[in-house]
């Protein structure tokens, strides 16, 4: 590998890069860091046949450099084939905290396909190879999740864009989304219309019934509407906050667990204060 300092206009995004570059609080901190100290960790790039370099790891750093008013960025130039570059690109981004389900799904799929192609090439050149893990189980081990989790996420790439957006926005939970992903595209579009009509998204049990109806060839507008009109069982209460809104009230060193514990303590103190005022 070679170190270089190319101009930003010579750096091109990775084809079908699954991760968004979001202008959030974390990015604003990165931009400020780049302004003060420059890019500390060089990006990884590979040469393009058309000229310039393809970014393998460093899309957010390039954006930060652009916003900081820099013209160049330090990089490590590596001669990588497409599959090796894909694996590095995915691994370098999956370490981030805030990743959308759509990003994780596409990233897992890209890495799985790259590993399978590498395995196929090895099978052609090696007459005897010891038994290997399934590629999705291998990815799961590397990421600290099960192979089933990897397979479930990859199934989300079968969702139509409207439903995938609902999953990203947490309007549809992951468990029902895995079931919905098994529906035919036209059935998913039918579900989009039904969700709009009912102003409700399917629960896990409803999604499971839709999947069974689809497999039996019985899922149509009437059966879908009947399933969606069923009264849902009470689900476990959950509450989520936008990280950027909460983080500004805590020291930068605080972990999410420390933030949660602090919020609980403040709520307990608030509850005691209310109880005392009601007793007066």
Language-model-detected regions and their locations in the chain:
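Short acidic DE-rich linear segments
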Residues: 272-280
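Structural motif corresponding to the C-terminal cap of alpha-helices
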Residues: 38, 43, 115-119, 161
């Amino acid at each position: 590998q070679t170190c270089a300092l190319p101009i930003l206009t010579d750096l091109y995004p990775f084809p079908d890069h699954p991760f968004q570059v979001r202008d959030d609080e974390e990015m604003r901190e990165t931009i400020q860091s780049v302004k003060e100290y420059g890019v500390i960790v060089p990006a990884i790039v590979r040469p393009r046949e058309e000229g310039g370099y393809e970014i393998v790891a460093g899309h957010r750093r390039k954006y930060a450099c652009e916003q900081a008013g820099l013209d160049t960025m330090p990089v490590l130039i590596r001669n990588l084939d497409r599959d090796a570059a894909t694996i590095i690109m995915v691994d370098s981004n999956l370490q981030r905290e805030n990743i959308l389900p759509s990003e994780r799904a596409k990233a897992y799929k890209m890495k799985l396909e790259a590993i399978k192609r590498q395995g196929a090439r090895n099978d052609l050149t090696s007459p005897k190879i010891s038994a290997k893990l399934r590629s999705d189980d291998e990815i799961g081990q590397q990421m600290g999740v099960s192979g089933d989790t990897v397979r479930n996420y990859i199934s989300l790439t079968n969702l139509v864009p409207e439903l995938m957006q609902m999953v990203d926005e947490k309007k549809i939970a992951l468990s029902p989304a895995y079931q919905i992903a098994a529906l035919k595209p036209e059935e998913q579009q039918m579900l989009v219309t039904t969700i709009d009509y009912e102003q409700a998204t399917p629960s896990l049990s409803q999604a499971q019934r839709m999947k069974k109806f689809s497999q039996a060839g019985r899922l149509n507008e009437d059966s879908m509407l009947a399933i969606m009109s069923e009264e849902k069982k009470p689900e476990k209460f959950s509450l989520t906050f936008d990280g950027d809104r909460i983080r500004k009230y805590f020291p930068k060193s605080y972990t999410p667990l420390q933030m949660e514990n602090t919020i609980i303590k403040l709520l307990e103190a608030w509850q005691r204060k209310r109880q005392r005022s009601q007793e007066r």
